[in-house]
């Protein structure tokens, strides 16, 4: 996270998420694996009056978050979300869940379902050996390397009801 600086790249993603999920004033959004909170910062710019929270395993990321959003972030793990059942209108987790071990991934899916009304996750995946090699070289913290079909198996096994996307390293 040391070289990860705010550059505005999350604005278009925040706009698409807000439009797709119909986010409005008063909605509550949780970002699991929020890093320094840049996406959450953009969400409060795009949807005034939205309430955002972020959770990240990195104490460094939370301590060095964008000042305008830092008070909304806390250190924690995806396998234990310290929030009440269905307390968020939307849970986002982008490029995070593949960093968990299988036993933590199972708990994380259950927690996402428990805490969120709507959910959106994006995970790294591969469709061929070239993409797998690229993923192996790029992702230093990845613990789970799954094809889209294998991720689909996880989604079904865990009863995941939210939206999902894959990112590939072509």
What are the residue ranges of the model-derived segments?
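Class I (Rossmann-like) S-adenosyl-L-methionine-dependent methyltransferase catalytic domain
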Residues: 1-21, 25-32, 36-82, 100-107, ...
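A conserved beta-strand element that flanks and buttresses the S-adenosyl-L-methionine
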Residues: 92
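Hydrophobic adenine-recognition pocket in adenosine-nucleotide-binding enzymes
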Residues: 96
């Amino acid at each position: 996270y040391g070289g990860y600086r705010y550059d505005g790249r999350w604005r278009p993603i925040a706009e698409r998420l807000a439009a797709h999920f119909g986010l409005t004033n008063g909605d509550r959004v949780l970002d699991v694996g929020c890093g320094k909170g840049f996406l959450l910062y953009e969400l409060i710019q795009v949807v005034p009056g939205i309430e955002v929270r972020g959770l990240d395993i990195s104490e460094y990321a939370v301590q060095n978050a964008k000042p305008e959003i830092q008070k909304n972030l806390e250190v924690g793990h995806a396998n234990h979300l310290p929030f009440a059942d269905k307390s968020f209108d939307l849970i986002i987790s982008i490029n995070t869940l593949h960093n968990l071990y299988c036993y933590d991934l199972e708990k994380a899916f259950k927690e996402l379902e428990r805490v969120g009304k709507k959910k959106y996750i994006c995970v790294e995946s591969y469709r061929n050996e070239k993409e797998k090699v690229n993923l192996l070289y790029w992702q230093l913290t990845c613990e789970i390397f799954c094809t889209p079909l294998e991720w689909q198996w996880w989604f079904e096994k865990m009863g995941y009801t939210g939206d999902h996307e894959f990112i590939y390293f072509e």
